[in-house]
Curated annotation (Swiss-Prot):
Principal location listed in the UniProt entry: cytoplasm
A GO cellular-component term linked to this record: exosome (RNase complex)
Record-annotated disulphide pairs: none
Pfam families for the chain: RNase_PH
Entry protein name: Exosome complex component MTR3
Functional summary from the UniProt entry: Non-catalytic component of the RNA exosome complex which has 3'->5' exoribonuclease activity and participates in a multitude of cellular RNA processing and degradation events.
Family named by the database record: Belongs to the RNase PH family.
Region (Disordered): 23-42
Signal peptide: none
PANTHER family named among the record's database cross-references: EXOSOME COMPLEX COMPONENT, EXOSOME COMPLEX COMPONENT MTR3
Entry-linked CDD domains: RNase_PH_MTR3 (cd11371)
Species the sequence originates in: Xenopus tropicalis (Western clawed frog)
Protein localization: Cytoplasm; Nucleus, Nucleolus; Nucleus
Transmembrane among keywords: no
Length: 270
């Protein structure tokens, strides 16, 4: 009997070992770990890891922070649909969380968050404005993202990682799509790139923004909680600044990955 290759094989219930680990202070992981309110976590990225995929990328936010892996397949020809299908390609996104990705019991999706289908649609809406789908008529591009470890701001990390993987696959794009998250602290302070503890301790206000940095255009915006005019404008500004800070890191990673693909010229022995 053929197996389900799309299903994440793992136990129905799982708990991360970090659930039982205490910090040096004897409690949970220590807050911002020295970061300022508007300072994002340092990011490590690498492209071209998976040989089986057309394009791939890995992103890690902070030491022991959120870890995301992405693979891109296609473009592949698909069946005739309608006028839109004939002139424009389609981007399909699958965003899932590994059973061991978070502390606490495994619930089958992101705890207290969207279902895998909803998360995939949110990822798709953030990426579509960056991809030149008109260049791939009657074709589809499949983006598969797995959150290996969720320590906060998983969706923005997935957007950045998927965008890097699309570029690594050679998919024509208008610009990279970069994501950044923000939450409102218990005292009303805006915290850029929050970790999981800060997200849980927040006062009901979170925001996830996707930006095309070169074009300076917002490709996706998701918020929860009540936001007043001035605070929402400040939150959007901080998220855009966070995306702009991330752009040089991904750009440099993409250049290195492209250079690795260029064959080394052999000396002429004649």
């Amino acid at each position: 009997m053929p197996g389900d290759s799309r299903r994440i094989r793992g136990p129905e219930e799982s708990q991360s070992p970090l659930l039982y680990v205490l910090s040096e202070e004897g409690g949970k992981a220590a807050g911002r770990r020295g970061r300022g309110p508007s300072e994002p976590r340092p990011v490590f990225v690498r492209a071209g890891l998976l040989s089986q995929a057309k394009g791939s990328a890995y992103l890690e936010a902070g030491s022991g922070g959120t870890k995301v892996l992405c693979a891109v397949h296609g473009p592949r020809e698909r069946g005739m649909g309608g006028e839109r299908a004939e002139t424009r390609g389609r981007l399909l996104c699958d965003l899932r969380w590994a059973p061991f990705s978070r502390r606490g019991p495994w619930s089958g999706s992101c705890p207290a968050g969207p279902s895998p289908r909803q998360a995939g649609l949110q990822l798709q809406e953030s990426l579509e404005p960056a991809v030149r789908l008109d260049r791939y008529p009657r074709a589809e591009v499949i983006v598969w993202v797995l959150v290996l470890e969720d320590r906060g701001s998983a969706l923005p990390a997935a957007v950045s990682c998927a965008s890097l993987a699309l570029a690594d696959a050679g998919i024509e794009m208008f610009d990279l799509a970069l994501g950044c998250g923000l939450s409102r602290g218990p005292g009303g302070e805006l915290l850029l790139d929050p970790d999981d503890d800060e997200e849980e301790a927040g006062s009901g206000g979170t925001m996830s923004l996707s930006l095309l940095p070169t074009l300076n255009q917002v490709s996706g915006l998701i918020s929860s909680g009540e936001w007043e005019g001035e605070s929402s404008e400040e939150a959007v500004r901080l998220c855009m600044e966070g995306c702009q800070r991330l752009y040089p890191v991904l750009h440099q990673c993409l250049v290195k990955a492209t250079k690795r693909k260029i064959p080394v010229p052999q000396p002429d022995t004649n």
